[in-house]
């Protein structure tokens, strides 16, 4: 895992690339390098910051240059040994043992045809000195980030958006439509970028820059096609051996020349991976977190720690427990900086603190259970939407009576949150809606009217544009399986837009690599070859994964109630962050600029304080958005995000 950057026919390219690379130092503290080459009346520059994981010697240093090709690469190839053997059989001679050299030689031999063969996580740029072409590539599922900015015939790229912002002299303007999307989702979708002009290279695609100024784009992997192929496979009765696929992926993800550990929450996904990893690495360290007792009680959070201890004891894992009682006022601006775009998921803080503790103990690589919920229908929203289909058949008067009764219930008392009431209110907010709208409403923060009421009225068209985009993505498939339609939408939007994005940025802020064995091309293929009826069986989500896990884990772990990799937001918002909430609501920059309406925010605060509704997540995201916007506009020298022109 590393940081990559570069310029192509960009003014003052060397200085810009040096600054880009310097901004990414946290992603690669083990080394740095640059490359330069003339290109007609311009130049190409590549930069790299190295976090050494495989082949710790100098032969793995980057940018790697060999016989007319120059490569700067961020990621890991888990099938590098197989590709190396094939290339050696074709006469290629390698200098070292890094996967970087394997990628370079695979590109030399096969060009873009090598891309579908890569199994791993990656973002890279390769320059051909003979043709003068630069190609940017991002992995199939969007695990690794790659941001770029084009101006005229020039291009600049980097692993993080903050690097582009740092070298453009404050000329990047905030995109108000992206902030609208952020408010809806509490993250910026992968199809959008918080700054106008900048973009994220889409997963499974490449972009080629030519010396004549032309740009060509291509796709080498399409999740929609994979899902459609999986549906046909399921119809034919070709059921995947899911236990074998997950076991193989976990084994491959352990490939490393430095210490590896796991996240262990005590839930199914992390417990399964940890148990499998412990087979190959006896005594492997695992990190788990807990919160201050009073915070956990206030939030009505489940006791995950006892399950993590049980797994560790059973499989001989070195469990390292971290109690999180963070100074959230201090962490909030720090995390906002590292996350690049406004992200309202407090799990990013958990990830950072765990990775920081692991790094301090000498661990560079962590395995995470990220992705299992999206691919195997493990979130509450998946089951809730399935139940909603049946709920919509209930007579209208009965539904209205139930909704009225639940609406009168409080979501919290002074001492304790009432999770069951929160869940019931959430369910009733979308249960009567059409399929796509219900699915969107089941995991986003606002409905259309609420969001428009929160924003500057001029941004209403942006709201409709964001909602239309969600509908288009959700419906863009040929699947006739409702559960797999939800899983596909999550894998295309929720996974790269939120979970993979914050995992990358939070872990790299602590100079730590996080690997995600469930977000593996072979696991994904297997996941979409499983019918929805085997993913949600009765009231059990992830049923097929649980079935596979019983070959390794005890049933009390497999079938325990679902935990939460989250944070005690209600406790933080009502105590630690209450003064900051008041400041942002009454005199924040977003309010003063007109982007957010003061009276709408004040109403949310009042209803939350009264226990009438739970707006803790909404207000947390307003805080993250405020901090992000202050930083963004201070660089740009203006403070109005409401223009959509």
Model-identified regions with their sequence ranges:
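Short low-complexity, flexible loop/linker segments enriched in glycine and/or proline
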Residues: 334-338, 360, 381-384, 572-574
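Alpha-helix capping and helix-loop boundary segments enriched in small/acidic/polar residues
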Residues: 299, 342-345, 393
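A structural signal for short hydrophobic/aromatic patches embedded in well-ordered alpha helices
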Residues: 20, 182, 402, 524-527, ...
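Cysteine-centered catalytic environments shared across enzyme families
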Residues: 1-333, 337-339, 351, 355, ...
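Active-site adenylate/phosphate-handling loop in enzymes that bind or generate adenylated species
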Residues: 140, 295, 353-414, 499-523
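Adenosyl-5′-phosphate
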Residues: 1-4, 113, 166, 171, ...
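Conserved S/T- and glycine-rich ATP-binding loop of Class I adenylate-forming
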Residues: 264, 369, 495
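A structural signal for short, well-ordered beta-strand segments and their strand-loop junctions
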Residues: 126, 135-136, 156, 208, ...
């Amino acid at each position: 895992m590393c940081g990559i950057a570069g310029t192509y026919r960009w003014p003052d390219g060397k200085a810009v690339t040096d600054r880009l690379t310097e901004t990414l130092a946290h992603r690669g503290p083990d080394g740095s390098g640059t490359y330069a080459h003339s290109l007609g009346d311009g130049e190409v520059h590549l930069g790299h910051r190295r976090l050494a994981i495989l082949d710790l010697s100098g032969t793995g240093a980057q940018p790697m240059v060999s016989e007319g090709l120059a490569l700067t690469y961020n990621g890991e190839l888990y099938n590098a040994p197989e590709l190396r053997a094939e290339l050696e059989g074709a006469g290629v001679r390698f200098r070292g043992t890094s996967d970087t050299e394997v990628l370079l030689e695979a590109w030399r031999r096969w060009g873009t045809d090598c891309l579908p063969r890569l199994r791993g996580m990656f973002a890279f740029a390769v320059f051909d000195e003979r043709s003068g072409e630069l190609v940017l590539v991002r992995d199939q599922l969007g695990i690794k980030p790659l941001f770029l900015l084009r101006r005229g015939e020039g291009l600049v790229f980097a692993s993080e958006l903050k690097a582009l912002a740092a070298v453009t002299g404050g000329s990047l303007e905030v995109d108000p439509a992206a902030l609208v999307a952020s408010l809806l989702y509490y993250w910026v979708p992968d199809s959008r970028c918080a700054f106008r002009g900048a973009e994220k290279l889409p997963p499974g695609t490449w972009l080629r820059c030519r010396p004549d100024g032309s740009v060509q784009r291509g796709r080498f992997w399409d999740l929609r096609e994979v899902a459609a192929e999986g549906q046909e496979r399921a119809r034919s009765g070709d059921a995947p051996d899911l236990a074998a696929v997950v076991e193989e992926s976990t084994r491959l993800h352990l490939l490393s020349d430095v210490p590896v550990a796991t996240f262990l929450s005590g839930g199914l996904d992390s417990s399964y991976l940890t148990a499998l990893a412990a087979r190959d690495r006896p005594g492997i360290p695992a990190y788990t977190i807990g919160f201050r007792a009073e915070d956990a009680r206030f939030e009505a959070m489940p006791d995950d720690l006892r399950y993590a201890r049980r797994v560790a004891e059973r499989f001989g894992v070195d469990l390292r427990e971290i109690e999180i009682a963070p100074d959230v006022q201090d962490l909030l601006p720090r995390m906002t900086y590292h996350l690049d775009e406004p992200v309202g998921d407090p799990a990013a803080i958990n990830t950072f603190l765990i990775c920081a503790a692991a790094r301090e103990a000498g661990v560079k690589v962590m395995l995470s259970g990220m992705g299992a919920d999206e691919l195997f229908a493990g979130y509450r929203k998946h089951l809730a939407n399935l139940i909603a289909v049946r709920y919509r058949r209930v007579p209208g008067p009965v539904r209205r009576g139930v909704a009225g009764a639940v609406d009168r219930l409080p979501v919290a008392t002074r001492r304790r949150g009432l999770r069951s009431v929160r869940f019931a209110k959430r369910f009733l907010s979308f249960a009567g809606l059409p399929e796509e709208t219900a699915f969107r409403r089941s995991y986003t923060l606002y409905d259309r009217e609420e969001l428009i009421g929160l924003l500057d009225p001029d941004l209403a068209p942006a709201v409709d544009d964001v909602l239309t985009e969600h509908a288009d993505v959700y419906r863009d498939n040929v699947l006739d399986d409702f559960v797999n339609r939800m899983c596909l939408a999550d894998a295309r939007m929720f996974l790269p837009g939120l979970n993979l994005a914050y995992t990358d940025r939070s872990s790299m802020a602590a100079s730590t690599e996080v690997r995600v064995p469930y977000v593996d091309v072979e696991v994904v293929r297997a996941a979409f070859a499983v019918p929805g009826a085997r993913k949600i069986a009765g009231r059990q989500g992830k049923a097929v994964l649980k079935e596979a896990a019983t070959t390794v884990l005890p049933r009390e772990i497999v079938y325990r109630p679902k935990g939460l990799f989250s944070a005690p937001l209600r406790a933080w918002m009502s105590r630690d962050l209450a003064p900051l909430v008041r400041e942002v609501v009454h005199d924040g920059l977003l309010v003063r600029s007109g982007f957010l309406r003061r009276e709408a925010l004040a109403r949310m605060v009042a209803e939350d304080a009264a226990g009438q509704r739970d707006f803790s997540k909404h207000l947390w995201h307003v805080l993250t958005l405020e901090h992000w916007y202050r930083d963004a506009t201070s660089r740009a020298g203006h403070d109005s995000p409401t223009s959509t022109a």
